[in-house]
Swiss-Prot record:
Cofactor(s) annotated in UniProt: pyridoxal 5'-phosphate
Family listed: Belongs to the serine/threonine dehydratase family. DsdA subfamily.
Catalysed reactions, as listed in the record: D-serine = pyruvate + NH4(+)
Protein's organism: Escherichia coli O81 (strain ED1a)
UniProt KW keywords: Lyase, Pyridoxal phosphate
N6-(pyridoxal phosphate)lysine sites (modified residues): K118
Pfam families xrefs: PALP (PF00291)
Gene responsible for this protein: dsdA
Gene3D superfamilies: 3.40.50.1100
TM helices/strands, residue ranges: none
Origin superkingdom: Bacteria
A GO term, aspect molecular function: D-serine ammonia-lyase activity
Name the UniProt record assigns to this protein: D-serine dehydratase
Top EC class of this enzyme: lyase
Lineage: Bacteria, Pseudomonadati, Pseudomonadota, Gammaproteobacteria, Enterobacterales
């Protein structure tokens, strides 16, 4: 972006200057509305989410057999919700900032099959595509026991079709493993940030991995191009897919059930704050949509991004969405948080969700490494760097009197609050890689 344009952007949006300087930045969204007002802009409804629930239930018998690690849960791919009181104390001590309310962790980092939040959307979209093909071919009815998809006849049928996706790692992992298990031929286009172990794991499942020297945007574009030339190839579009988004949104009702089980209340007097790491936006966008449908105006969602990849904060704050990239303002999009190394946000998610999100913030790689170490020490939970992005949120919210006043939170409401950090990945990180992460924390 030439200087004159850049200066006028900063004059209009002074916060951009902090982003350019790679400062850890928090922006509380002044444009947040009620669910009733914001919902029409999403273009999806509660019914769409119910359909996704139903589809995952139909596939449960199949998943229970195809992936024995899901059998105990009856073929439902869900993660634990745990309190992390020792980490809460550690954060308060390190930042000299009390966190009122209770701190919880949602362990999508340990989801079965692929060990990340992408096991929600990625697996769901592969299943939805497989179902559509099998129904159209007359091989399946909605009433069938879907475990029949494991038969050689189905394997043979699906092998005529292929799937392609562009990914920084975790989405590729979930789509690759699921597609290969069903019988699709699958190609994952991996950006330069992708970890070597993720590529190796995919190849061990018989997935074709194409590597790029460039970032996420290039990998997605190349994947899209490769798929266009083959009518039997289905491209899973992380930037624009409504299906992926709905796969994530199912988490809202599931979390509501977990809260009920644990006797946790969410209402006007007991607000829920949720902190979601954000890459291109599909995962956190879908989850936030599901949370809003489940908890209404009593849930407050925040997106967290690396200082080197603040694409969603930049897009929503300036209103330019996918018309601007972090590279346009001179930011390099290089971060240890490989899952969040995205320079241009999803225009679909930004426009759909901007009224339903309370805020956005950035944090440095070093902050993520530090918190990764603290969580391992205090709670014995090991995550990958990007999964810690949400952990900086509670202290930002508790420190901002202006945000609390904007939403009219009383001291008592904040004392009764639940702060939920969404841990997005790390359950499958190899030991020696994890030790390298731990060594970088202070």
């Amino acid at each position: 972006m030439e200087n004159a344009k850049m200066n006028s952007l900063i004059a209009q949006y002074p916060l951009v200057e902090d982003l350019v300087a790679l400062k850890e930045t928090t922006w509380f969204n002044p444009g947040t509305t009620s669910l009733a007002e914001g919902l029409p802009y999403v273009g999806l409804t509660e019914q769409d989410v119910q359909d996704a629930h139903a589809r995952l239930s139909r596939f449960a018998p199949y998943l229970a057999k195809a992936f024995p690690e899901t059998a105990a849960a009856g073929g439902i791919i869900e993660s634990e919700l745990v309190a992390i009181p020792a980490m809460q104390k550690r954060l308060e001590k390190e930042y000299q900032q009390p966190i009122s309310g209770q701190l919880l962790l949602k362990k999508d980092s340990h989801l079965p099959i692929s060990g990340s939040i992408k096991a929600r959307g990625g697996i769901y979209e592969v299943l939805a595509h497989a179902e559509k093909l099998a129904l159209e071919a007359g091989l399946l009815t909605l009433e069938d026991d879907y475990s029949k998809l494991l038969s050689p006849e189905f394997k043979q049928f699906f092998s005529q079709y292929s799937i392609a996706v562009g990914s920084t790692g975790n989405l590729g992992l979930s789509i690759g493993i699921m597609s290969a298990r069903i019988g699709f031929k699958v190609t994952v286009h991996m950006s330069a940030d992708a970890r070597a172990w993720k590529k190796a794991k995919l190849r061990s499942h018989g997935v074709t991995v194409v590597e790029y020297e460039q970032d996420y945007g290039v990998a997605v574009e190349e994947g899209r191009k490769a798929a266009q030339s083959d009518p039997n190839c289905f491209f899973i579009d992380d930037e624009n897919s409504r299906t992926l988004f709905l796969g994530y949104s199912v988490a809202g009702q599931r979390l509501k059930a977990q809260f009920a089980q644990q006797g946790r209340i969410v209402d006007a007097d007991n607000p829920l704050f949720v902190y979601l790491p954000c890459g291109v936006g599909g995962g956190p966008g879908g989850v936030a949509f599901g949370l809003k449908l489940a908890f209404g105006d009593h849930v407050h969602c925040f997106f967290a991004e690396p200082t080197h990849s603040p694409c969603m904060l930049l897009g929503v704050h300036t209103g330019l969405h996918d018309q601007i990239s972090v590279q346009d303002i001179g930011i390099d999009n290089l971060t240890a948080a490989d899952g969040l190394a995205v320079g241009r946000a999803s225009g679909f998610v930004g426009r759909a969700m901007e009224r339903l999100l309370d805020g956005f913030y950035t944090l440095s790689d070093q902050t993520m490494y530090d918190m990764l170490g603290w969580l391992a020490q205090e709670e014995g939970i090991r995550l990958e760097p990007s999964a810690l992005a949400g952990m900086a949120g509670p202290q930002r919210v508790c420190a901002s009197v202006s945000y609390q006043q904007l939403h009219g939170f009383s001291a008592e409401q904040l004392r009764n609050a639940t702060h939920l950090v969404w841990a997005t990945g790390g359950g499958m990180v190899p030991e020696e890689e994890m030790n390298q992460y731990l060594a970088k924390g202070r």
